[in-house]
């Protein structure tokens, strides 16, 4: 069967740079501009349609509608606005200067570790450079130096940000202006791994030596409600919110990133089916191998002989959760799987001290060790 290729889109950073370039051109030429061509960081030339054009002698504004392609991006369809305001610079030998700020709907950085200074608008370095260079380029043909003030805004950015991990990363009040290539790859693992790296950078900058890596929000909440300390549930110093990092299905990447960034201790948190996949050696737990995982689990339980808490035949089991429930949450059974998950994780990142927390489907802690 032929499947239609997924369509790529463009980052908020590329859209912001295009809008700023369009506004700058309107301000310089004092006429409406319908479209601008932007050169992305890897050299690709892309045309962006402009909307909402307004201008007078001192300022101009417009917006680009974010197109994320076939990626399920919450910012798809968002209006990325830019306003460029100018002041004459009456100094001999002076050069045109560009200052970029965030307006309504663009978040503010409140925690270290993100590559953007605390207190600054959440506009990442590559988009910041694209915006600055694009505006300067438009005014490079003007003899009189200018001071140009660029404001990037997203009208519904604060509401959209609630659907992202921005608050956890310490970005408050709106969205981030992101992108290193200008292109959004559809359903890309890179979006997850970029967020993982950012969350770990924030955690390390905040002094966290113990990181809680969870496979999802449900299991993470179990760990939070259990009062995870640096030595486990209800023990030691309570961990700050920055220590909690959702790795999703990217266990291998997350563990190696922790090791690379100097993390010392990791608490791996997940529900039974995900921990079973880790125990079976999967670095990416989204893989469709449930049947093979259950076969491996059957072999492990066979080694227990008469002590096995799971009645046969195995052909009647369809899911890992069903097996756990049939065992009656047997402690020996849970320890078997969690120990193997911990050992598999340690093989992926030998420098880390790793412990495993099994989150029950009823939101309780079933195992820690």
Curated annotation (Swiss-Prot):
Reactions performed catalytically: Co-precorrin-5B + S-adenosyl-L-methionine = Co-precorrin-6A + S-adenosyl-L-homocysteine
Top-level division of the source organism's lineage: Bacteria
Enzyme class: transferase
UniProt keyword Transferase, yes or no: yes
The keyword Methyltransferase appears for this protein: yes
Pathway assigned in UniProt: Cofactor biosynthesis; adenosylcobalamin biosynthesis; cob(II)yrinate a,c-diamide from sirohydrochlorin (anaerobic route): step 6/10
One GO BP annotation of this record: methylation
InterPro entries noted in UniProt: CbiD, CbiD_sf
Gene Ontology molecular function, alphabetical: cobalt-precorrin-5B C1-methyltransferase activity
EC nos: 2.1.1.195
Keywords attached to this entry: Cobalamin biosynthesis, Methyltransferase, S-adenosyl-L-methionine, Transferase
Family statement: Belongs to the CbiD family.
Designated name of the protein: Cobalt-precorrin-5B C(1)-methyltransferase
Organism the protein comes from: Geobacter metallireducens (strain ATCC 53774 / DSM 7210 / GS-15)
């Amino acid at each position: 069967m032929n499947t239609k290729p997924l369509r790529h889109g463009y980052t908020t950073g590329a859209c912001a740079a295009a809008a700023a370039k369009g506004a700058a051109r309107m301000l310089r030429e004092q006429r409406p501009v319908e479209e601008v061509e932007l050169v992305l960081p890897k050299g690709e030339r892309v045309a962006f349609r402009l909307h909402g054009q307004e201008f007078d002698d001192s300022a101009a504004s417009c917006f680009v509608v974010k197109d994320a392609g076939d990626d399920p991006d919450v910012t798809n369809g968002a209006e990325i606005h830019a306003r460029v305001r100018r002041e004459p610079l009456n100094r001999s030998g002076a050069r045109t200067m560009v200052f970029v700020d965030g307006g309504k709907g663009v978040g503010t950085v409140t925690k270290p570790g993100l590559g953007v200074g605390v207190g600054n608008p959440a506009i990442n370095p590559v988009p910041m450079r694209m915006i600055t260079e694009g505006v300067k380029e438009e005014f490079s043909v003007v003899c009189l130096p200018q001071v140009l003030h660029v404001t990037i805004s997203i009208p519904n950015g604060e509401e959209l940000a609630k659907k992202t991990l921005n608050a956890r990363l310490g970005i408050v009040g709106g969205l981030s202006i992101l992108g290193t290539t200008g292109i959004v790859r559809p359903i890309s693992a890179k979006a997850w791994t970029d967020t993982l790296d950012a969350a770990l950078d924030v955690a390390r900058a905040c002094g966290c030596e113990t990181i809680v890596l969870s496979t999802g929000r449900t299991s993470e909440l179990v760990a939070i409600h259990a009062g995870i300390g640096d030595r486990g549930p209800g023990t030691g110093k309570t961990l700050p919110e920055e220590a909690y990092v959702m790795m999703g299905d990217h266990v291998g990447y997350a563990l190696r990133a922790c090791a690379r960034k100097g993390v010392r201790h990791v608490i791996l948190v997940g529900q039974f089916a995900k921990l079973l996949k880790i125990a079976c050696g999967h670095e990416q737990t989204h893989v469709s191998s449930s049947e093979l995982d259950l076969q491996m689990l059957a072999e492990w339980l066979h080694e227990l002989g008469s002590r096995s808490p799971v009645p046969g035949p195995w052909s009647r089991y369809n899911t890992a959760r069903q097996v756990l429930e049939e065992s009656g949450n047997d402690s020996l059974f849970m320890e078997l799987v969690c120990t193997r998950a911990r050992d598999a994780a340690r093989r992926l990142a030998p420098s880390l001290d790793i412990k495993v927390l099994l989150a029950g489907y009823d939101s309780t802690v079933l195992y820690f060790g």
